């Protein structure tokens, strides 16, 4: 009975720690932010402030990984699969590299690549969607049909096929995933912009002689930002998971560079011996994904204008 209840005990402890982190982050933000923003944060749910704290921690790790990591990313230090000890707090991996250092550099590589990919996908998809909705006609039809064809192909299969053809370098990985996700951003941007271009203030701007880019930049984009910002967070989650999945399958970030998805595969044999080390990179992937979703959910709630 005690063995069965142990996981529930750990889950309760984890939830309590998350609540404390969320409350502490909210209290700190209320103190440092201007009064107007502090009022908004004061009423934020603990899930949102917990997500902010987690995202901030990941950003610090990404920016300061070489300073935080006790050892180098690729240095073989000792025997493989050493248990947790004072020298190696999380043991060593399948080649004898420090697991803690690999996790830190894995966060830097995975999050950095995912962010760059999301920015590229968002720029391509949002610009295409805004142009298609604003100009309409043959351009809208052409871009929409191209997106329909790309979205008809399962994204993971498309990525596997393209990476097998082009090679598994980081630029190719970023390009392929960006193409896959730009189609989703295009759909959202086009749908949002299509509802805005028929508004009276947009027609008035056209009658005043506003050019295409001025029309998009001054009239359409500011009113389309809330859903697009939320979509950016969601796209980052999907890109982050896609890159981790491809690395797990061997077509993402290549050794000896650290990547969270690849680290799960490399140390999977430890699960046979009841070692939780392979779970750590998977837990880091899940934690960031959940944190970003918490913040995006709160941002959508704010932009919708709904009241508690």
Regions found by a protein language model. Name each.
Residues 160-161, 165-187, 231-263:
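Non-cytoplasmic
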Residues 25-42, 65-68, 113-148, 160:
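Transmembrane-helix boundary motif in ABC transporter permease subunits
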């Amino acid at each position: 009975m005690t063995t069965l209840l142990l996981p529930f005990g750990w889950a309760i402890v984890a939830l309590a720690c998350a609540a404390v982190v969320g409350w502490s982050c909210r209290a700190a933000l209320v103190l440092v932010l201007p009064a107007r923003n502090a009022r908004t944060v004061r009423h934020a749910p603990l899930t949102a402030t917990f997500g902010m704290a987690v995202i901030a921690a990941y950003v610090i790790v990404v920016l300061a990984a070489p300073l935080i990591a006790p050892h180098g990313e690729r240095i073989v230090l000792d025997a493989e699969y050493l248990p947790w000890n004072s020298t190696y707090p999380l043991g060593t991996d399948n080649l004898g590299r420090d697991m803690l250092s690999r996790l830190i550099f894995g966060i830097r590589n995975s999050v950095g690549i995912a962010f760059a990919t999301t920015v590229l996908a968002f720029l391509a998809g949002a610009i295409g969607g805004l142009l298609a909705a604003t100009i309409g006609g043959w351009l809208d039809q052409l871009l929409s049909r191209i997106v329909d064809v790309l979205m008809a192909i399962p994204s993971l299969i498309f990525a596997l096929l393209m990476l097998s053809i082009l090679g598994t370098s980081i630029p190719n990985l970023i390009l392929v995933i960006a193409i896959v996700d730009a189609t989703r951003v295009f759909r959202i941007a086009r749908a949002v912009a299509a509802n805005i271009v028929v508004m009276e203030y947009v027609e008035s701007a056209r009658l005043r002689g506003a050019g295409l880019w001025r029309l998009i930049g001054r009239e359409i984009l500011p009113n389309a930002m809330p859903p697009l910002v939320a979509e950016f967070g969601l796209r980052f989650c999907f890109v982050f998971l896609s890159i981790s999945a491809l690395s797990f399958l061997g077509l993402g970030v290549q050794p000896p560079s650290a990547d969270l998805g690849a680290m799960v595969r490399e140390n999977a044999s430890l699960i046979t011996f009841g070692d939780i080390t392979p779970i750590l990179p998977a837990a880091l992937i899940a934690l960031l994904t959940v944190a970003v979703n918490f913040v995006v959910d709160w941002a959508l709630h704010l932009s919708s204008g709904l009241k508690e």
